[in-house]
Amino acid sequence: MLLSELSHPNQLHGLTVSQLEEIACQIRERHLQVVSTSGGHLGPGLGVVELTLALYQTLDLDFDKVVWDVGHQGYPHKLITGRFSQFDSLRQQNGVAGYLKRSESKFDHFGAGHASTSISAALGMAIARDRKGDNYKCVAVIGDGALTGGMALEAINHAGHLPNTPLVVVLNDNDMSISPPVGALSSYLNKVRVSPPLQFLSDSVQESVKNIPLIGKDIPEELKNIKGSVRRLSVPKVGAVFEELGFTYMGPIDGHDIGNLVKTFNAAHKLKRPVLVHVVTTKGKGYPYAEADQVGYHAQSAFDLTTGKSIPSKKPKPVSYSKIFGQTLLKICEQDSKVVGITAAMATGTGLDILQKNIPDQYIDVGIAEQHAVTLAAGMSCDGLKPVVAIYSTFLQRAFDQLIHDVGIQNLPVSFVLDRAGIVGADGPTHQGQYDISYMRSIPNFVLMAPKDESELQRMLITSINHNGPTALRIPRGSGLGVAIMDEGWEPLNIGEAEIIEGGEDILIIAYGSMVASAIETAKILKNMNINACIVNARFVKPLDKNLIMPLASRIQKVVTMEEGTLIGGFGSAIVELFNDNEINIPVYRIGIPDVLVDHASPDQSKEKLGLMPDQMADNIVKKFKLVN
């Protein structure tokens, strides 16, 4: 059978191992062809091809439920669930999403873009199944990196106390999340992974299997058939941690051996209780460059399949904000040993990899554990260190309570750098950094800022570190504007001080962060209509520079705010509140992201759809204030 002929995963039923292996080759070929052309997540999907095929041969996907953690691993799933012909549109506007999405396919049982959610969701489905009296299977597939997340461990703790609730958790152990995994759990899994087999399953498990009505007597023989691949240690006991938590542990087994995977999954389903199947895979399997550099090929822009090298853009791009942040923080750390960079499994993405390589003693990776990262930083600041926590805007949402309870209330000097703030593009609604202005603005004691360019980023970083209280600095995804930066001697900003970029008396545009550049372009278009705009770079959303903004607004009487974030509770709302609190009755036109989810597309396509391109904003400003007769 050809992969292109698969329209339903149940068509895998009855296929031989050799037929499944042929489909596996076709999946990798299609996966590589599409990602090399348009970009996307490469290594994770290549590593779970055999796992996916084997698992789906043991399930009826019209009834059974599978929850894939994060969705990085979901490309093979998409290719065998009716999206082969549309796969060229991966991560493109109106195309196939890069993550699982319930609205896209009935086989996407649960959507996810953030890690560590799968076991909770699958357990919830299992509990609902049992209460309804149904009998479908529920499976969670989670990577070893995601298993470091507290939510996953909370779910394991809960599921283990439900011994009569059938649930299969497949641990896809490739010893790699996005960055190399960290922590004691990772070290434990590594010991399990390399340990020799001493005993196959415990006598108690075999005995419990025998006691299953009708089918119990047949299972031990089936289990014996997979003795070579499903292993369990006696001393030290492999899987002891999971078994103490109430799971039956099976593994570790070869995640690329389809025959043994099928037998193992069938055995796991028959146990009718919480089972953890430990599958060892190779991230990037089948593509030598991805196997050799599992971090670099986790996700890729378009690249040459033959050489494995990225296809350079036609025009050289300025250095990214993330890299400039990392380079600047490294310089600061070299001058001050009390400054420590903290990341949650995103060293490369946040630019902290340069700190990790050069001054590892001033670098901490906590794994996929944002809540822990925030409170860890709070504790460090209590005893004189100066923590700088670099986390994507979308992931910091996961630690909102810690931001309030552990940092804000205690007014601790922790610096947060929110990477990927604003519209991020192809990763879609789970990754858009559109909420941080709103959720951070409500926390007392925090100072919030966003730079207009790379140089201002450097000044804001030193301002944050020097400030005796909590700060949050948001930076956008992608390249900077190409302005000159300094290697040292950055001048701190005065907290809450804005600047006038351009004078004008017809309209006042107050822009925040990345939207300052767009405001300048918008003003140029307005100028061609003989409309002169005054442009203010707010720099800070909290505190606002009321001494600058209110007199300008009172004089010009027409105000526009621009932000790359949700309008609800955002920067524009802060301006409206400022005017209202000071009894200034001035019309304000807020431009930003309305109350919608921003789907996957290129950043410019998303901005155009939202009306955030300069020509659109200029046109809407003119219409709003009737500036042209």
From Swiss-Prot:
Binds 1 Mg(2+) ion per subunit. Binds 1 thiamine pyrophosphate per subunit. The keyword Thylakoid does not apply. Its cofactor is Mg(2+); thiamine diphosphate. Its EC number is 2.2.1.7. It comes from the Bacteria. Pathway: Metabolic intermediate biosynthesis; 1-deoxy-D-xylulose 5-phosphate biosynthesis; 1-deoxy-D-xylulose 5-phosphate from D-glyceraldehyde 3-phosphate and pyruvate: step 1/1. The keyword Transferase applies. InterPro entries: Dxylulose-5-P_synthase, THDP-binding, Transketo_C/PFOR_II, Transketolase-like_Pyr-bd, Transketolase_BS, Transketolase_C, Transketolase_CS. GO terms for cellular component: cytosol. It catalyses: D-glyceraldehyde 3-phosphate + pyruvate + H(+) = 1-deoxy-D-xylulose 5-phosphate + CO2. GO terms for molecular function: 1-deoxy-D-xylulose-5-phosphate synthase activity; magnesium ion binding; thiamine pyrophosphate binding. Keywords: Isoprene biosynthesis, Magnesium, Metal-binding, Thiamine biosynthesis, Thiamine pyrophosphate, Transferase. GO terms for biological process: 1-deoxy-D-xylulose 5-phosphate biosynthetic process; isopentenyl diphosphate biosynthetic process, methylerythritol 4-phosphate pathway; terpenoid biosynthetic process; thiamine biosynthetic process. Disulfide bonds: none annotated. Mg(2+) binds at residues 144, 174. It is an enzyme of class 2 (transferase). Homodimer. Catalyzes the acyloin condensation reaction between C atoms 2 and 3 of pyruvate and glyceraldehyde 3-phosphate to yield 1-deoxy-D-xylulose-5-phosphate (DXP). Belongs to the transketolase family. DXPS subfamily. PANTHER family: 1-D-DEOXYXYLULOSE 5-PHOSPHATE SYNTHASE-RELATED, 1-DEOXY-D-XYLULOSE-5-PHOSPHATE SYNTHASE, CHLOROPLASTIC. This is 1-deoxy-D-xylulose-5-phosphate synthase. It comes from Prochlorococcus marinus (strain MIT 9301).
